[in-house]
Amino acid sequence: MSFTDQTYTRSCMHTCITRDHRLYGIVIISLLLLLDNSVFCQNENKVIDIKKDEKIWPYRICSGMSQATDIVRFGRNIQCPEYSPKDEGTEGILLIYKQNIVPYIFPVRIYYKELTIRYRYADVFSYYDMGDVTKKIPIMETEKTLIDMDGKCYSAARYVEGGAYMDAYDGDEHNHTVPFMLGYQNPDGGVTRYVTVDTHRPCLPGTWLRKTCTTVNCIVTDTYAKSRYPYDFFAISTGEIVDGSPFYTGDNDKKFSETYTKFKVYNEYERLEELTVSSTKKRTFDKIAFLEKRDYSISWEVKEEDQAPCQYVLWKASTQALMTKTVNNTYHFTSRELTATFGANDKEELKLAEKYPCVYEDAKETFEKMFSQNLKDTHVLNNDAKNNYSYVSHGGLILIFKPVKNKEIVQLMNITHLLNNTHANMTKHRRKRETSSSASSKGIYDLYGDLNVAQVQFAFNTLKSYINQALMSIADAWCRDQKRTNEIWGIISKINPSAALSAIFDKPVSARYLGDVISVSKCINVNQDSVRIYQTLKVPKTGEEWGDRMQCYSRPLVTFRLDNETASTIRTGQLGVDNEILLGNYRTELCQENSIRYFVAGAQIHVFQDYDFYHTIKLSDVDIVDTFVHLNISFLQNIDFQMLRLYTQEEQYASRLLDLETLLRDFNTYRQRIYKLEQAIVTKPYVPPAGMQQALQGLSGVGSVITGTLGAMQSLVSGVASFLQNPFGGTLSIILIGCIIVGVIIIYNRMNQSRGSPIDYYFPYVNQTLPQRQLQQHVGDPPSYDESIGSSHTYSKEDALLMLKAMKELDKSEKEAQIEATKSQPSIIDRIRRRGYTTLSSMNI
C-alpha cells in the first residue's frame, strides 16, 4: 500500500484527532523542553523530525543491491608455527624481497618501407577502385646508414617475390633521396613515427582506361621494447616480437634465435636523435645492434645485463621482527608491523653475493639506513651471530634477516663478562700464595664479587629465559587467536553477513553469500535531513476486517529522499537496525496488547506504546552491556590488519610486454584508411528445394545428372550476373547490345527494300544511263525490221543463261570499278593532313 493513499491518510488523521488535545499539547511541550526533539503532525501524516548524530552510522540503504562490487572469503586451514621452549628466538631487522615483474624497458628504432600499389579504372561518370596491395619491406643495412646519418631515405624499394627481385618507385618516378617529416607522436605511449610521404600519390586514370599507381613510404618509428627475465626475447610496443636477447652481442652466450646473417653489431655508432629536417643533434652509442627481419628492420643499444632491473625488489621492511627456529628445523619470521609470519627451510640458505648481487648490495644499504634511523639509540648489532640470514620463503620471497640486541641486555652481559674475568684473574694470583695465607687473605670483596657474579648470571639467565618464553608464547597465542577469530567470524557471517562484514570493515556494508564467497556492496547514504519517522505503527484498514487483532508494523515507517533528488520527492520505507532504511512496508505483525517498543534512530530512542508514539529518550541514557574484559596496561598499541598487496597496479601495468592500449592507439592513429581486401571466390553447389531434392534423389543417377545440370546453369547465370555487375563488363555489354540493335535495324530496312524493289536492290546499276561511248558504236544504218524485233517473242534457256552470265560479268565489273574508285580516294589520315586543299581536275594534253 502506498503511503499517500487516502485510507492511510484518514487513519493518520484519526490518530491525531482522537487524542486529548490538552494532554497531547502537554506531552509535546514536555518533550520539547526536556528532550529537545521536535514531534509534530505535518499536514495529514504524523512524522518525527530526527536529529542525526555524526558519530554514528548515517541513514543508508543497504538492502536490495542487485549486484555487488566486491567478493571476499574467509581463510581456511591457517597453519601456525609450532613453537616450543627449545625454539631459538632472535630479534632483528627483516627485509622481504619479491620477484620484480617490471620488465627491462629500452628504446628501439624500427625501419621499413610501406609499398602501396593501387588499381583504378574510370568511365565517363566516375572512378572505380579495383583494389590495392600493401607490402612492408625491410630497409637494408646500407640504406639504414643514410637514414641515421643524414635523415634521408631512397624513394625506391626492392623486394623479392617469386624468386626474383622486384623494384618499385614512388610515384612511378626515378629513384632519389627524400627527407623525413614527423608523421605521428604519442609521448604517453613513447611512439614517434617519421615518414617521407604523408598521403598516397594521386591516381586518376583517363576515361575508359585502367591505371596502376605506386606509393613508397619510408617509415621510421622510435619506440620502446620490453623484455622479462631471463631475457630470451623482447616485445615492441607496436606488436612485433624479436626472438632473441636484447643483450646479445654476437659473441656471448645469450639466446638468439633470429637469422645470424641478418644481424650485426656496430661499435661507437653515431646517429641523429630526431629525423626531422631541422634536427642536427646526434648521439653516439657504445654498441648498437641491427637486425633485418622479413618485413621490417630494427636497431637497439646493446648494454650489459647487470644494467637491467634487479630480479627481486624490496617489498616490505620491518625493524621489529622475530626469527624463530622450530623443532622441525624451519625458520619462521614474524613481523609486528606486517602482522604476518613467513616460513622457510633452514637448509636453503642463499648466497646472495654470488647469485643475486643486486639484492645483496641493496639489502646491505637498506640495513645500514634502517639501523641508523630507527635502532641506533636502543640496539646494537649482534656480532655473535651471523652477519645476516637469507632464505627463500615458501611463497618464493627472499627473506633477509639481520640480528640485533638491546643495549641494556648487552650492558648486562658485559658486566657479567667483566666480573667473570676479574674472578678468574684473582683466582690465578691466589694460587701463587701460600696455603696458610689463603684463607686469611680472602677478603669481603672476593666473596662479594663471587656473589655478584652468581646473582648477575642468575638474573640474566632468568631474564633471558623469561623473555624468550614470553616472546614465543605471545607469537604462538597471537597466531592461534587470529585463527580462531577468523573461524568465529566465518560462522557469524553465515547468520548475518551484513552485520559481520560491517563490524570487520568498521563501516556499514551490505553482504550476502553467493555460494562459498561473500558479495560485499557499499551502502547508499540518503539525505540525512530528509528522514522522517511516522508516529504510529498501526496498519490502516482497507475495508476488510482483520479479525480479532489488527495488523501492525514491526518497524517504524519512514520517508526519505536521496541527495540528488528534489525536496518534493518522497520515498518510503521502514527503519532498520543501526539507522538502516529497509525498503518496502511489508514487515508487519499481529498487534499485541500493552506492547512497548524501543527503536533507535540517530542519537535518540523513540518509544512506541500500544503501537503509537509515546516519547523519546536519549541514546546515551541507556546503559551498554559491557562485554569487554579490560586489561589494565598502559602503552598498549593497537595493530591494524591490512591486506598485503604483493604487486601494485603500477607494477602489474608495467609488467605487460605488449600493451594493448598503446597498440590500439597506434593502430587507430596511423592506419586510418581501410584497405580493400580481395574476396576469395567460393563456388557454391546448387541446392534445389527440399521437395524437389527428395524427388531427384529418388531418380538415383538421373537425378544426380539433373542436379549437376541445374548447378552448372546456376553457375553460368551467376557468372553472367557477376560479369554484368563489373563496371567493365556492364559497359561492354551495353555496347554489344547497342551494336546488335543497330544491326537488326539495318537488316530490317534492307529486307523491306528487297521486298519492295528487288531489281533495284539486287541490281542497282540497272537504272544507270549508258555511257556516251556505248551509243557511238551504234551510229550508222539502222537494222532491218526483222533484225530489230527478232524472230520470236520468247527467249530460250540458252538466252536466259547468256543473260545471267552477262549480268554476272556486269556485276563483277561494277564491283571492281567501285573498289578502284574507293582506292583512288584519300584515306582519313590524308584528309586530315591535306585539309584545306582541293583536288585539281586532271586534263589530257
Swiss-Prot record:
Keywords: Disulfide bond, Glycoprotein, Host cell membrane, Host endosome, Host Golgi apparatus, Host membrane, Host-virus interaction, Membrane, Signal, Transmembrane, Transmembrane helix, Viral attachment to host cell, Viral envelope protein, Virion, Virus entry into host cell
Disulfide bonds, paired cysteine numbers: C62-C523, C80-C479, C153-C218, C310-C358, C552-C591
Span of the annotated motif Internalization motif: 837-840
Any one GO cellular component localisation term in the record: host cell Golgi membrane
Intravirion topological segments: 749-845
Region (Hydrophobic membrane proximal region): 677-725
Its membrane topology: Single-pass type I membrane protein
Annotated transmembrane regions: 728-748
Positions glycosylated per UniProt: N175, N328, N388, N414, N420, N425, N564, N632
Subcellular location field: Virion membrane; Host cell membrane; Host endosome membrane; Host Golgi apparatus membrane
UniProt region (Involved in fusion and/or binding to host membrane), positions on chain: 120-126, 204-212
Virion surface face of the membrane: 42-727
Role this protein plays: Envelope glycoprotein that forms spikes at the surface of virion envelope. Essential for the initial attachment to heparan sulfate moieties of the host cell surface proteoglycans. Involved in fusion of viral and cellular membranes leading to virus entry into the host cell. Following initial binding to its host receptors, membrane fusion is mediated by the fusion machinery composed at least of gB and the heterodimer gH/gL. May be involved in the fusion between the virion envelope and the outer nuclear membrane during virion egress.
Protein's UniProt name: Envelope glycoprotein B
Organism expressing this protein natively: Elephantid herpesvirus 1 (isolate Asian elephant/Berlin/Kiba/1998) (EIHV-1)
Lineage: Viruses, Duplodnaviria, Heunggongvirae, Peploviricota, Herviviricetes
Designated gene of the protein: gB
